[in-house]
């Protein structure tokens, strides 16, 4: 595995498969937050301490112990260009916060479904990504990596509180479980705000696709647990799974309602969006996300039969600004990005050959 491959293949290998409920649930993520004993937390650590932690993981884990899990690559943020860091964020392999951290690093598996962030908000953040709804499977994978780390490093752990973290909401198990879910029908029927409020009352958080402070582009929402103290990993997973299953049923019911009451209007909306994607010469990322959401809904409902659902997932990633510029080989102005985005979408939908 090389940096060039990570940068030039916009779609991570793990994204190419389907998972359970993948018509509505795009992906599952498990993240475990850990800190090392006898080191200052990242907010207070020196450059020397940060580098010591990175070297510790490089020498004792990436080069040795983790070989049993396959090939891994350690990337230091201060050795990457701003554009390369942005691509990693857009592929959901690192957080926006890590991308801005001078002494941060990440460890990536070859399939990119395992990503370990070093010196972010906590010393160690183990992330596992799976397609569809696979919370238990992702947790099992993350725990395997965590167990390997714990044989080599000593974590900051309190017998009463659990794992000690920078943010109080992560103290305890250090577990953040999240699900990326596509809810266009709940948005169209204007039920989404009421449902989000109900979810938040259950102690869960609803955010946009890039986490805290981001918007729900393309009707894609990220639902995750908030507190970890006083709850077991199993309880956290069970609670979130229950809510996601309810969300899936609500979304399916909303889709059935729209088809029953407004079928022709919905079909028109789907094909208008498809027309924009198929023929536009300039398209901004927000408009592309909206149209891709409409077309994905049209595929799920059977209106569009000759386009793969996975192509839409792929295009949601491919059309992000950083990845577009990586493909172009450098920085692009806003209009040039919009032009290349439109061309890429047309090409991926195999429209150009029909227009020739």
Curated annotation (Swiss-Prot):
The reactions it catalyses are: L-arginyl-[protein] + ATP = N(omega)-phospho-L-arginyl-[protein] + ADP + H(+)
**Regulation acting on activity, per entry:** Appears to be allosterically activated by the binding of pArg-containing polypeptides to the pArg-binding pocket localized in the C-terminal domain of McsB.
**One Gene Ontology cellular component:** extracellular space
Question: GO molecular function terms here?
Answer: ATP binding; creatine kinase activity; protein kinase activity
What parts of the sequence cross the membrane? Answer: none
A Gene Ontology biological process term: phosphocreatine biosynthetic process
Arranged from A to Z, the UniProt key words for this protein are: Allosteric enzyme, ATP-binding, Kinase, Nucleotide-binding, Transferase
Q: Which residues form the signal peptide?
A: none
Q: Which InterPro entries match?
A: Arg_Kinase (IPR023660), ATP-guanido_PTrfase (IPR000749), ATP-guanido_PTrfase_AS (IPR022415), ATP-guanido_PTrfase_cat (IPR022414), Gln_synth/guanido_kin_cat_dom (IPR014746)
The Phosphagen kinase C-terminal domain, residue ranges: 24-254
Q: Specify which residues bind ATP according to the UniProt entry for this protein.
A: 27-31, 92, 125, 176-180, 207-212
Q: What is its EC number?
A: 2.7.14.1
Q: What does this protein do?
A: Catalyzes the specific phosphorylation of arginine residues in a large number of proteins. Is part of the bacterial stress response system. Protein arginine phosphorylation has a physiologically important role and is involved in the regulation of many critical cellular processes, such as protein homeostasis, motility, competence, and stringent and stress responses, by regulating gene expression and protein activity.
Q: Give the family from UniProt.
A: Belongs to the ATP:guanido phosphotransferase family.
Q: What is this protein called?
A: Protein-arginine kinase
Source organism of the structure: Bacillus cytotoxicus (strain DSM 22905 / CIP 110041 / 391-98 / NVH 391-98)
What lineage does the source organism belong to?
Bacteria, Bacillati, Bacillota, Bacilli, Bacillales
């Amino acid at each position: 595995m090389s940096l060039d491959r990570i940068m030039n293949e916009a779609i991570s290998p793990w994204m190419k498969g389907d998972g359970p409920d993948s018509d509505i649930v795009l992906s599952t993520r498990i993240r475990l937050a850990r800190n090392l004993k006898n080191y200052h937390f990242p907010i207070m650590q020196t450059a020397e301490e940060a580098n010591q932690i990175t070297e510790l993981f490089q020498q004792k884990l990436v080069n040795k112990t983790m070989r049993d899990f396959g090939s891994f690559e350690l990337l230091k943020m201060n050795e990457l260009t701003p554009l390369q860091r942005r691509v990693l964020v857009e592929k959901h392999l690192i957080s926006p916060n890590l991308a801005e951290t001078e002494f941060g690093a990440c460890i990536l598996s070859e399939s990119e479904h395992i990503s370990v962030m070093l010196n972010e908000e906590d010393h160690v953040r183990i992330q596992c990504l799976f397609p569809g709804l696979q919370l238990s499977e992702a947790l099992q994978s993350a725990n395997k990596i965590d167990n390997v780390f714990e044989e080599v490093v000593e974590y900051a752990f309190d017998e009463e509180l659990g794992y000690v973290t920078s943010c109080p909401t992560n103290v305890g198990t250090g577990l953040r479980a999240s699900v990326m879910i596509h809810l266009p029908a709940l948005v169209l029927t204007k039920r989404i705000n009421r449902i989000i409020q109900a979810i938040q009352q259950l102690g869960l958080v609803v955010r946009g696709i890039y986490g805290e402070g981001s918007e729900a582009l393309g009707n894609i929402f990220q639902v995750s647990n908030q507190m970890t103290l006083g709850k077991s990993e199993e309880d956290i997973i069970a609670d979130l799974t229950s809510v996601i299953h309810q969300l899936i049923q609500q979304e399916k019911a909303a889709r059935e309602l729209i088809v029953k009451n407004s079928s022709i209007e919905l079909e028109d909306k789907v094909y208008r969006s498809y027309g924009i994607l198929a023929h536009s010469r300039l398209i901004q990322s927000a408009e592309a996300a909206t149209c891709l959401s409409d077309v994905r809904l049209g595929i799920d409902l059977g209106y569009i039969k000759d386009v793969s659902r996975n192509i839409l997932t792929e295009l949601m990633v491919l059309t992000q600004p950083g990845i577009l510029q990586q493909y172009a080989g450098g920085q692009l102005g806003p209009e040039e990005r919009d032009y290349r985005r439109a061309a890429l979408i047309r090409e991926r939908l195999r429209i150009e050959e029909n227009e020739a």
